């Protein structure tokens, strides 16, 4: 914008100067004019060329004066008489001294045409655009936005698992130890969770049904407490042997500590389950002809009746008894009826 104002000022100033046969130019004026001409040449040469296909034809009078005509006006302003092809000569009539200075060609150099996408200035959108001024009209050079990197999916940290311990020849039922929460069984596909430290109670699902899930493919009647303890000891020894080489690795330190805590809980649960299983085997698997300690039998029966006293009315109702146990339940019910009718039992009950 400043260059256009300067150009107009120079044109007006040149038209107001009277045309005399000779012009006296001082050194300061000559230096200023040379400076202005050099600035205008740089401005003209710095304007990028426009594509031929994008040029608009216009008959308006503002395009009559070309750059060459403007250059000739400046040449008339500072030259007189004959001009040389190489240099312009300024002659001072008083001292007859000549001053030469090179004149620049006002024809802009045509460089390599740069391929660009231009849009009208009225369709500018609020995005990354830059305005490039041409010699005659402005147009918009749109910069292609850089492709944004595709958002990467958030990677969720996978839970750490302990190294898989394969079974050895000495323990045919041990499969693997994967995490401090669950243990998987290969033959039955059962996962036993040890997060809860509650021991099976008498109400609801009995411990006999729980023990069937812990058999790992072995028949529940042949699976005893010694086998359970031996199984736990085998797992313990295999875990210790598998983790001996990884104790120095800090990446496995957290898993090793979690495994130790899990093993402690497993041993505690095994001891509690052993005690419960002993009690349940004595109370429910005791046959009439089996020899056992009488004190233990009495304690077992009384504890069982005491713990289930709130649900005795349901146990005595035949509709709550499973079909496969109704024959045994009928025998128990008849025995209880006969006991209630017996005078001996009635006399014993009066004592309490």
Swiss-Prot record:
Modifications made to the protein after synthesis: Glycosylated. In testis there are two predominant forms of 77- and 67-kDa and a form of 47-kDa, whereas in epididymal sperm from caput, corpus, and cauda there are two forms of 47- and 43-kDa. Testis forms contain complex carbohydrate residues. Epididymal sperm forms are N-glycosylated. Then undergoes significant glycosylation in the testis and that the majority of these glycoconjugates are removed by the time sperm reach the caput epididymis.
Q: Which Pfam families match?
A: SPESP1
Bias (Polar residues) occurs at: 166-193
Q: Where in the cell is it found?
A: Cytoplasmic vesicle, Secretory vesicle, Acrosome
**What keywords are assigned to this protein?**
Cytoplasmic vesicle, Developmental protein, Glycoprotein, Signal
Tell me the first and last residues of the signal peptide.
Answer: 1-19
Q: Offer a single GO CC term for the protein.
A: mitotic spindle
Name any Gene Ontology BP term.
Answer: sperm-egg recognition
Residues bearing carbohydrate: 128
| Region called Disordered, residue ranges | 140-203
The domain of life is: Eukaryota
Q: List the disulfide bonds.
A: none
Q: Which family does it belong to?
A: Belongs to the SPESP1 family.
Role summary = Involved in fertilization ability of sperm.
**Protein name listed in UniProt:** Sperm equatorial segment protein 1
Which species does the entry assign this protein to? Macaca fascicularis (Crab-eating macaque)
Source gene?
SPESP1
């Amino acid at each position: 914008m400043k260059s256009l104002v300067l150009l107009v000022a120079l044109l007006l100033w040149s038209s107001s100067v009277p045309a005399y046969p000779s012009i006296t130019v001082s050194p300061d004026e000559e230096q200023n004019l040379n400076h202005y001409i050099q600035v205008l040449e740089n401005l003209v040469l710095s304007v990028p060329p426009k594509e031929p296909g994008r040029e608009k034809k216009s008959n308006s009078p503002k395009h009559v004066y070309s750059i060459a005509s403007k250059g000739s006006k400046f040449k008339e302003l500072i030259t007189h008489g004959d001009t040389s092809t190489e240099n312009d000569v300024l002659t001072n009539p008083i001292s007859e001294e000549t001053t030469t200075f090179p004149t620049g060609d006002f024809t802009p150099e045509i460089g390599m045409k740069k391929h660009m996408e231009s849009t009208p200035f009225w369709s500018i959108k609020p995005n990354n655009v830059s305005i490039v001024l041409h010699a005659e009209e402005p147009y918009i050079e749109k910069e292609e936005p850089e492709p944004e990197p595709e958002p990467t999916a958030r990677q969720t940290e996978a839970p750490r698992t302990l190294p898989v311990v394969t079974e050895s020849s000495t323990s045919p039922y041990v499969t693997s130890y994967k995490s401090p929460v669950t243990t998987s069984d290969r033959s039955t596909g059962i996962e036993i969770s040890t997060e809860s430290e509650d021991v099976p109670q008498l109400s609801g699902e009995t411990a006999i049904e729980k023990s069937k899930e812990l058999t790992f493919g072995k028949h529940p009647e042949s699976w005893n407490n010694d086998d359970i303890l031996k199984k736990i000891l085998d797992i313990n020894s295999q875990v210790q042997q598998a983790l001996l080489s990884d104790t120095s690795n800090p990446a496995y330190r957290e898993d090793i500590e979690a495994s130790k805590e899990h093993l402690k809980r497993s041993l505690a649960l095994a001891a509690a389950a052993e005690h419960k299983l002993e009690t349940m085997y004595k109370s429910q698997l005791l046959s009439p002809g089996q020899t056992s300690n009488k004190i233990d039998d009495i304690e077992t029966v009384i504890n069982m009746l005491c713990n289930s006293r709130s649900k005795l009315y349901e146990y005595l109702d035949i509709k709550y008894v499973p079909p496969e146990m109704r024959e045994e339940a009928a025998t128990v019910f008849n025995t209880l009826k006969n006991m209630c009718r017996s005078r001996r039992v009635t006399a014993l009950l009066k004592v309490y």
